[in-house]
């Protein structure tokens, strides 16, 4: 858990974007949906890492569903705080108590962020997918061209159903057939809650024993059923076939990411069976090292049929149909994947005995103990069927796509007439008329394209070709250590090699799923209490998405930057004001709601927001206007009158004065000492000084063997420090540096003795004080007052006052009286920078103490 995450490419993108003064609306769009932009490039793709910068975990015992919902919730809360100035997290369990944000609104927004091709449980994978290896500058034009081809093809694929709507509706008018003849048992598995499943033909309910099942993602129209690690679903009266009986079983199947079995190895397990795990009599469908196998067994291996087929994806939904003609021969077994016949290899064809067994039909395992049941844990199922005949190839082709649509049309005859959304809206007076949901539309489109695949296949081929070109351009840049696990030494080497540009960078990005985005409203916010399904939508009390914008993150970005959106520009300019003046025009910059603070100058906030938007979202122009204003340039001196009437400077009666942020304090100290390394822009994170043994308790991750970097990289700006969420940098945390467990729009500013102690004892600040003292001694060899003013100019940007000079001169005499060679040697040994041995150590230590005092002053710490 909380292992190293390779995402410095996103940080570098942000730096470049501000330096280039990228229009802020484009900056927002790239971060929310850079992967979906048809005119995007590598920078835009990297920018989408903003969405991926949330929590992840590889911790054993993690409940995947809980982690997944926490991940989506964190993204939605971050979006609300960053772009809306709203506490969306208050609507997780119920409607917002103060703001007009309903629980439906919250989960509708969450739907935008839950449709990425990722897994929440990472297994401590350094290359948490989706990710992108960054190519070299020389290859950028070719890479951007390939990326553009992929984005355009993916956009065309998403729009293909709408483009072909007339043909789809005409095809629906022909009445797709349902495969019902010989249907013995049908498990739609659409209950969406509870531990019982219903067989639709006979209406019988079957209870799940052991762990309750999980109801989650689905490939078509309904919620799917997933077995947990110890779920047992047994159906004693289903699937009891003999070797001379023809039968078929089919269903949507989704294997979990990784399955490991101590006896049978990794990625092996039973999908569905009616077989005793002890004597192995019966039939079963299972995977061995992800390869699909179908078996009918009387006695293994001398009296059995066994065929092997395709390798199945992990994870990924596939529709499988297995038919057997009752011939007793392997040639009588047919397997279809997504409606297409699968090439099979016969590995046994000697069946002569009975395959009947008293063992029940089992999902995800065979009957028997765990040691013999070969379970395929965390396997998803939907629409599982059993027939008393061998289906034809044409029928098998209809099962994955046409049959669900035919079922809908059979139950809802109005759907055909209402397939056109405009007609559906016009027909609201008809109690049966309604608009198709995104998944119903997708199912109809899938059914049509399964029969007319030419256009879709061409787009899929273009996507694959573009991806191949992208991979070829970045293959030589891929950091090899990402394949090598969690060895701390390898991680250290990777960071060092990347800094020296010996290897490339890998960064987390977004990649949208092909399926429509959705979410479930959760009762009381509990991940197990799924309620109504909702689709991407903006809050009901705000203007809707712009017409024609897609229901995904790209549409959300268009809404955020729309001139009709009353929040975004105000929230952004308020944060810019906060950065310069210390406090925003709305003090609660993360909460513009009822509970938040009212604007101190509402007309000014409105003016700045409109001005910012109408001048091309030009951030540098706005900053320039603010810093050149009379409000910013006035004196920060606090008079008694201002103290009484405006103690918190809410009315901007004086210039800004506030303590700098943690990173600024560290960087200012290093800059004053001449140590700050500004030679290189961007690059990987580095490991700064931390107290010895701080990470020794973090066992089993690539951070447990912490070793700080050495040489010039150790003195880079604080924005490049490697941060660990569960173990923040102590020298930054003491100055209210954030832990990055959640998005933070406004930092606290506290004043405790720990801050002074850190400045007097932390290695970074002591080393900076030593270097500044050495610089002062060399630059001003004799005059003590001039030397003190030299250090003040470096730290305070002004000469010392008479009172300050007298205090430091007095401190100098005290230090001289107390210092000796032994003590000086210990004090000067701090840090890695070698000192000039020609300087008297006692003198050096005295001036190091004076430099430290200046660093610890309010004048040095406050802006």
What is each PLM-predicted segment?
Residues 155-479, 483, 489-494, 501, ...:
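Extracellular glycan-associated modules
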